[in-house]
Amino acid sequence: MYFDTFYNIIKVAGELINETPLAIRTGTQAIGAIDNPIVRIKGVPYIPGSSLKGALRSEAERYARSIGEKICDIINPNGPDGELKLKEKRKEEYIPCIICRLFGGPTIFSRIKFYDMFPLNGIYKTSLIQRVSINRITEAQTPGRLFDVEFIEPGTRFDFRLEIENFKEEEEKEADILKFIVKHLIEGNISLGGMKSVGFGKIRLLKNTVNVKEYKLKNGELVENVITSSFLSGLLK
């Protein structure tokens, strides 16, 4: 549907900073008995692109519902509102929901690529904090239930990159959704990882570092295009 031909690629790059401790965890215990280690590649902590994609998709869904868009159930694609079930019922008339058209789903590829983000110039610090498990009934600590949480210290800068493929100016609602999630990132309204309820994971895209470029196909090669799109020029306003 959106990949039959090639139209353009929009590349957004910049720097992202964690304003509060960031703990995107592996879910397994690390060697050395850290209870909740953060994710790493070759020893370097990073922000998985999938983590940011999930957070932004949730925000995009909230926005889409607020403007009256019906959203597919991607958690249960065979359920009554699931994409696979809707496609089966509507057949040739089926069109994926606006969120699936941007972020992908069971029947369509994502048009947005989120890249893993690593600390700029390899500069970062990690720390441990000790927490205690609280009994929800007694509201008192549970004896013997201390645990350690590893996190990336606030102020770490990450290399941010995303790409949008085959985006056209006339897709006004899709453009509004993209502007909304980019604005949320710039305003620091997105949180990632664990312990968000106690303030962990707040991130911000630094507006003065953001660069937006559009590339189109010319003579078999990707060539940077002069930005005339009101969507692209207004993306950071």
What are these regions (language model features)?
Residues 1-237:
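RNA-binding basic/glycine-rich loop and surface signature characteristic of RAMP-family CRISPR effectors
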